[in-house]
Amino acid sequence: MRGCLQSVKWLTSAVRQSQSLTSSTRFPRRLFNTSTLHYAQGRKPVSELEQRIAAIPIERFRNFCIVAHVDHGKSTLSDRLLELTGTIEAGANKQVLDKLDVERERGITVKAQTCSMLYNHQGEDYLLHLVDTPGHVDFRAEVSRSYASCGGALLLVDASQGIQAQTVANFYLAFAEGLKLVPVINKVDLPSADPERALDQMKNTFELDPKSAVLVSAKTGLNVEQLLPTVIEQVPAPVGDHTKPLRMLLVDSWYSTYKGVILLVRIFDGEVRAGDQVVSFATGLKYFVGEVGIMYPGQTAQSVLRAGQVGYIYFNPAMKRSQEAKVGDTYTKVGSEKLVQPLPGFEEPKAMVFVAAYPVDASDFPHLEDSINQLTLNDRSVTLQKESSEALGAGFRLGFLGTLHCSVFEDRLRQEHGASIIITPPTVPFKVIWKDGKEEIVTNPALFPEEETLRAKVAELQEPFVLATLTFPEEYLGRVIELCESNRGEQKNLEFFTSTQVILKYELPLAQLVDDFFGKLKGSTKGYASLDYEESGWRRSNISKLQLLVNKVPVDAVSRVVHASQVQRLGRLWVSKFKEHVDRQMFEIVIQAAVGRNVVARESIKPFRKDVLQKLHASDITRRKKLLEKQKEGRKRLKAVGNVVIEHKAFQAFLAK
């Protein structure tokens, strides 16, 4: 008993000693708060990079982009500039800013990517912000958003190809934004290079002074070191005041599994730090900032983003819903809403090409939905609507800016999410003007009015037209005019901007343009033509819905609104192609292409034949006729009640190009 009491006394004294030690020794208390990161606000710049950036005033900021036609060397030039400023190590062509698999495979830029650079010019540090923009017409929304965060642009032209259609289009976009343009002639090291011709084209087409142009080779690095001093001297510094309330523009967004939605922002006024609470003008939702930083070239955390800078932020707790990140939205700090005027934002791009997407396996629909939602977060110009088909099940109707945009989205869906999908051929919207004066835009061919409704209730049908600008060598002029005329085009203008190069303008139906017009144009000109287009309004048109019928039952997944001149050709093509992919049945299958009740093409698949005469004697004619009649009646009954089973792979093969 005595031993037990001694043990208790020893334990009691030990506890008292530990309590006195705890009270006398003050350990720092670590506060965990999921909403705010208070410690980040008071953090001083520690890295050499942060110290250098903190010492640079807004007068020594430069935000610029590179404007060019597809494949004129934008991404390669970006690499050389990043190497020159020490942002990345010198080496082979890395295409640092082309981060998507599809960009590296196709050699094109799809997403506008950004990077900050530090450059010492005449003993002073400058903070340069470079945007690598897409060149293709389909990604014009990306281009126009990029221009909003820039003060100037390098207008890049290939010395061997000269000015192309998208050079012209992107020049006018940049000019409309008021950007200061620096002419640059690239690929001067090629044997086929003709810099003098390219300079003359710039002078005649854009009225730019050839003396201000810089002749470079992005591949070899020739004269690239002259570009950044030219940018510093000619491109104006961004305007902003870091002492004013925060005014922050959302330029782009992408999704991270761990951080939620990450925003690319341009700071116009004020500054933002981790721990600040900001509010969206578009949604009214409030968020605590988890981290701010710059792209250098990857995400590099910073203490603060100041007026004039472009960088990224993400929130803590994270922004989980991609729909909350509205591109063109303005953010400010909570409490400053009445002091800040929201920025005008961006014009929403209109989808002009529509496809339907279905999973090959119906059970994959939730996975497909999740995959599409993640991709649309990074690409705001895609419109999304659920739809259902009797033949293919549940799916989505997707709207795109153009055919390349559609093709790239499909590639990204397959590569980045492994989704096995069926994509229908691209279609365009049509306008229905009813007799009561109402107007309706129809994007789904299945919802296009039937022939009886058209005659009774519809006053007029219209289809969209575009003004296409085509540039190509003069020797192919006859072939290109013939191609445009066969696609219902109307010539608007023809000019020679050099002795060998032609600019041809045609008004074309958008439906013809999405039907592989660019591929046919490349074929007619041996790949030397370039194409750009802009909307040209709606026109009255003789259009109708072409349907595919199997045993007189319409297949809803295969219907298309076409011009009267295309009905016969497309109808015959459909029935012959669909016949190849449908398996024989025990009864005859009739495949028809029809406009309303008018059948324009027909094919039939003969049934399997059982030899009912096998056991008969050759001379038993009466019995022979009786068995054949019986077999014929049986087939009629089977055809009347039997359903044609068409597998998904048949649709997949039929809808593939």
Swiss-Prot record:
MF (Gene Ontology): GTP binding; GTPase activity; mitochondrial ribosome binding
One family name in Pfam for this protein: GTP_EFTU
Annotated ranges, domain tr-type G: 59-239
GO BP, sorted A to Z: positive regulation of translation; translation
Family of the protein in this entry: Belongs to the TRAFAC class translation factor GTPase superfamily. Classic translation factor GTPase family. LepA subfamily.
Subcellular location: Mitochondrion inner membrane
Protein name (record): Translation factor GUF1, mitochondrial
InterPro entries associated with the record: EF-4, EFG_III/V, EFG_V-like, G_TR_CS, LepA_C_sf, LepA_CTD, LepA_IV, P-loop_NTPase
UniProt: GTP binding residues: 68-75, 132-136, 186-189
